[in-house]
Structure formats: structure tokens, C-alpha cells
């Protein structure tokens, strides 16, 4: 394989992993522990 192909596959898998982790963090079982800064700030 060429170096560019390996690099593209690595970057694509890294982006997919980060996206999957952020979705899991936002909507997963621990999402109930996240706080909303807009709810904490009263006008």
C-alpha cells in the first residue's frame, strides 16, 4: 500500500472513533450525570 492510502485510512478511522465516542458520551448511560450550563445560569 502507498503511504497516502495508509494515512487516509488512519485519519478516517480516527475521526470515526472520535465521533463514536462523542455520541456515546452525549447519549450513553453516563449522559444523565452531565450538567447543562444554561440551566445553571438563571436570568
Curated annotation (Swiss-Prot):
GO CC, alphabetical: chloroplast thylakoid membrane
InterPro entries: PSII_PsbN (IPR003398)
Subcellular location: Plastid, Chloroplast thylakoid membrane
Keywords (A to Z) from UniProt: Chloroplast, Membrane, Plastid, Thylakoid, Transmembrane, Transmembrane helix
GO BP annotation list: photosynthesis
Ranges that cross the membrane: 7-27
Keyword Hydrolase in record: no
Keyword 4Fe-4S carried by entry: no
Record membrane topology: Single-pass membrane protein
HAMAP family: PSII_PsbN
The protein's role, per its UniProt record: May play a role in photosystem I and II biogenesis.
Family recorded in the similarity comment: Belongs to the PsbN family.
Name of the protein this chain belongs to: Protein PsbN
Organism: Guillardia theta
Source species taxonomy: Eukaryota, Cryptophyceae, Pyrenomonadales, Geminigeraceae, Guillardia
The encoding gene: psbN
Amino acid at each position: 500500500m502507498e503511504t497516502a492510502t495508509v494515512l487516509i485510512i488512519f485519519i478516517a478511522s480516527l475521526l470515526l472513533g472520535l465521533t463514536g465516542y462523542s455520541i456515546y458520551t452525549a447519549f450513553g448511560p453516563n449522559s444523565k450525570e452531565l450538567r447543562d450550563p444554561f440551566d445553571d445560569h438563571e436570568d
